Amino acid sequence: EEKAKSQALDLDDMGACLPAKVVIRSGSYEDLDDADILVNAIGRSRKEGETRLDMFGDSMERLKDIIPKIQDTKFRGILISITNPADVVGECLRKALGIERFRCFSTGTSLDSLRIKRILEEKTGYHRNSIEAFCMGEHGDSQIVPLSRVSVGGKPFAKLQKEYPDTLGKITIEDLQDEVRQAGMTVIIGKKSTEFGIGIALSGIVKSIVYDEKRIWPLS
């Protein structure tokens, strides 16, 4: 409770720099009664050499005391889970709380889809905002990059590879998939946890819901 208050106070110090009035405070489970969106971030950081699936037991152990407290509220909003393993934990939460699929989901491969754009920008030199690409499947080691759906400035990437065989033509789907799968661990080895990438992905999803943007996100 004290940590929550301190965290809220620390965040609220930036209030004067925000473009609109935002109330940042700590709260209680009773606040969920009329909440529109609940984000589950319970869990620990992934350890070096550990897969996301290896974290399942610890994640659910931490959630077992939280789930009944949510059940005791009148929460009828949308629950977004970012706890790893994201896809599995999100589904377990949905079943435990008896929430419809459209009201309870994880961030899926949203973060991975941001990462593949960064990787392609580094490899091709094109700005990532001109690159259309996304990851499918599990947020983990089995995710895939559908190369047939990758384009740069509207031009299929496969066509660009044929036009530039000595540069873009040397980029393989295997290399792309391996790099995006290892991206999270690369960050963890250097700083012990991932924060900002998943944070911007989550905020984008929340914004899409609040403003009904009709955007498509690869969730699960």
Q: Where in this protein do the model-derived segments appear?
A:
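N-terminal glycine-rich phosphate/adenylate-binding segment common to multiple enzyme folds
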Residues: R46-E48
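Conserved NAD(P)H cofactor-binding loop of Rossmann-fold oxidoreductase domains
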Residues: I42-R44
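Redox-cofactor binding/interface segments in oxidoreductases and associated redox assembly factors
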Residues: L38-N40, S81
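Rossmann-like NAD(P)(H) cofactor-binding subdomain of soluble oxidoreductases
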Residues: R52-R118
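Conserved N-terminal Rossmann-fold NAD(P) cofactor-binding segment
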Residues: E2-A35, E50
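C-terminal substrate-binding/catalytic lobe of Rossmann-fold NAD(P)-dependent dehydrogenases
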Residues: L97-R103, D112-S220
